[in-house]
Amino acid sequence: MIKSIILQAIMVLSTLTSVHGANSSGCGKQPTLVNGVHKINDREYILKVPDNYNANKPHHLIFGLHWRGGNMNSVVNGESVEPWYGLETRAQGSAILVAPNGRNAGWANINGEDVALIDAIIKQVEDDLCIDQSSRFATGFSWGGGMSYALACARAKEFRAVSVLSGGVISGCEGGHDPIAYLGIHGISDPVLPFDGGVTLANKFAANNGCQQTYVGKPGLGSHSSVQTDFKGCSRPVSFIAYDGGHDAAPLGVGNPLAPDATWKFFMAA
């Protein structure tokens, strides 16, 4: 079973194009994939294609990864967050979005099986739809943040950027030596995945990206505010936003634009 997962991952990865690549083979095709649930191997995901989809226009590809105890519907419907982490509305038809389902309501990524799932979804989607292969992104909260971090480690050459919301090293970090644009967003009073751990994740990619060592600022306790730190001298951008709060899927409250705005802006500038 383990050998099969690894072999499948190697075969799929060999077909993926790096962030320096061109447009996907789905460009110019009449698509067969439609909005809704799709199955791949023994897993599933929800796909959202823009209403004004143009098969000749390359789109961003954005993965929204759910938290522990959630599922793909939690991301799509916006349970405790804006739907699609607020990125669908900000994309204004420029992105195709994917919400995969984790195993057992999480992303343990045993033997890399969840990274292999993402690889397989990318291939299936890009074979059918028009994607700018230099414009793949991932974001998620808590365990979804941990899975986004795992993708930054294992697939830095395939993804342009990740946004890790209150994440930790809970889905592994195979590889983890290559540069990738990295945004971390973390509550200073997080009781589940501590704030200092979130800073450590960002510092790892600051080192990979050749950034200067930087002090990460924090807002005052009870200020209901945030402080953004942008690392300097980086080959790929690294930023970290500390906010006054705990382990929150929607930093500073549901409907607050902090995380969606920062994530979208970071992705588009990466």
Swiss-Prot record:
Its biological purpose: Involved in degradation of plant cell walls. Hydrolyzes the feruloyl-arabinose ester bond in arabinoxylans, and the feruloyl-galactose ester bond in pectin. Active against paranitrophenyl-acetate, methyl ferulate and wheat arabinoxylan.
SUPFAM superfamilies: alpha/beta-Hydrolases (SSF53474)
Family affiliation: Belongs to the faeC family.
Glycosylated residue positions: 23
Protein source organism: Aspergillus oryzae (strain ATCC 42149 / RIB 40)
Catalytic reactions on record: feruloyl-polysaccharide + H2O = ferulate + polysaccharide
Signal peptide: 1-21
Keyword vocabulary terms for this entry: Carbohydrate metabolism, Glycoprotein, Hydrolase, Polysaccharide degradation, Secreted, Signal, Xylan degradation
Highest taxon in the source lineage: Eukaryota
Compartment(s): Secreted
Protein name (record): Probable feruloyl esterase C
